[in-house]
From Swiss-Prot:
GO terms for cellular component: cytoplasm. InterPro entries: GHMP_kinase_C_dom, GHMP_kinase_C_sf, GHMP_kinase_N_dom, Ribosomal_Su5_D2-typ_SF, Ribsml_uS5_D2-typ_fold_subgr, SK_arc. This is Shikimate kinase. It is found in: Cytoplasm. Signal peptide: none annotated. Pathway: Metabolic intermediate biosynthesis; chorismate biosynthesis; chorismate from D-erythrose 4-phosphate and phosphoenolpyruvate: step 5/7. Belongs to the GHMP kinase family. Archaeal shikimate kinase subfamily. It catalyses: shikimate + ATP = 3-phosphoshikimate + ADP + H(+).
Length: 290
């Protein structure tokens, strides 16, 4: 039995590391997974190489949940740069879980699929909090606000917006984040989260960005460059190194910010917030560029 799953990357409104409460939005960058149930072993393979423990554990936990005694072959491909703050791990786990459920011809509630992926991330040590907020955005689409400690979805909204992404060439793995320094800024991150709960996502993003840039040692220059152009919804994404900005769907705001950010080393591109749930997608077979 073989099937496919697709899940989205995401951008940060509030990083959950400081206070265990977070907010994120899905973006139009996808990870595809193909799962074939066969044999006794669970084996994962990532296009371009990489650590396959997360997708293997996500598949294993899903099969346990479904009561299916089988091995599996998992293959993933992705448009999301790894260790960039754009939620590549959440997308990989979600896509794998969706594909596994489909291969087993069974269905699981989307939030339960998210919780399986979060547990897999904690089990293999790729996340500090399990990234329930990022995983919810990746799976459900739109903007989400969550309590990561309780694995509770507090709020989900549709948001129509273009997104400008600046992805520097370097990488920053979430599991290597300086948690102690992040917890020092907790009172102010709590304030930013309250602002986000009131629906002022752009203001919350900017505050989150300045706070985490300071705590984690990233430059705030890209945020200031966006503010100079009147783009107020801008932040460091996750634990970096990427930055994301919400911009108008109309006019030249996206082009102006893309030009400004292109002065920095790395890649700049424009995408959009995705409001459709990944669990609704048909999924695509992984076609590797080999």
């Amino acid at each position: 039995m073989k099937s496919h799953g697709t899940a989205y990357g995401a951008g940060t409104i509030i990083n959950a590391i400081a206070v265990w409460k977070g907010s994120a939005f899905a973006i139009d960058l996808k990870t595809h997974a193909t799962v074939e149930l066969r044999g006794d072993l669970i084996e994962g393979e990532i296009e371009g190489g990489g650590d396959s423990r997360l997708i293997e554990r996500a598949c294993e936990l899903t099969l346990d949940k479904l009561g299916v005694d089988s091995g599996a072959k998992i293959r993933t491909t992705s448009e999301i740069p790894i260790a960039s703050g754009l939620k590549s791990s959440s997308a990989a786990a979600n896509a794998t879980i969706i594909a596994t459920c489909r291969a087993a011809r069974q269905s699981v509630d989307p939030l339960e699929m998210v919780r399986i992926g979060v547990q897999a991330a904690l089990d293999v040590g790729v996340s500090v909090t399990g990234a329930f907020d990022d995983a919810c955005a990746s799976m459900l689409g739109g903007v989400v606000l969550t309590d990561n400690r309780e694995k509770a979805l507090l709020k989900r909204e549709v948001l129509e917006s273009k997104v400008v992404v600046y992805a520097p060439d370097k990488k920053a793995f979430s599991a290597q984040t300086d948690v102690k320094k992040s917890r020092l800024i907790a009172p102010w991150v709590e304030t930013a989260f309250d602002i986000a709960m009131r629906g002022d996502y752009r203001k919350a993003m900017a505050l989150n960005g300045f706070l985490y840039c300071s705590a984690l040692g990233f430059s705030a220059e890209p945020i200031l460059a966006a503010l100079e152009l009147g783009v107020t919804g801008v932040s460091l994404s996750g634990t970096g190194p990427s930055y994301v900005a919400l911009v108008s769907e109309e006019g030249e705001e996206a082009d102006r910010l893309k030009k400004a950010w292109s002065a920095y080393p790395g890649r700049v591109f424009v995408t959009e917030v995705i409001n459709e749930g990944a669990f609704l997608l048909e999924g695509e077979e992984c076609r590797w560029n080999t």
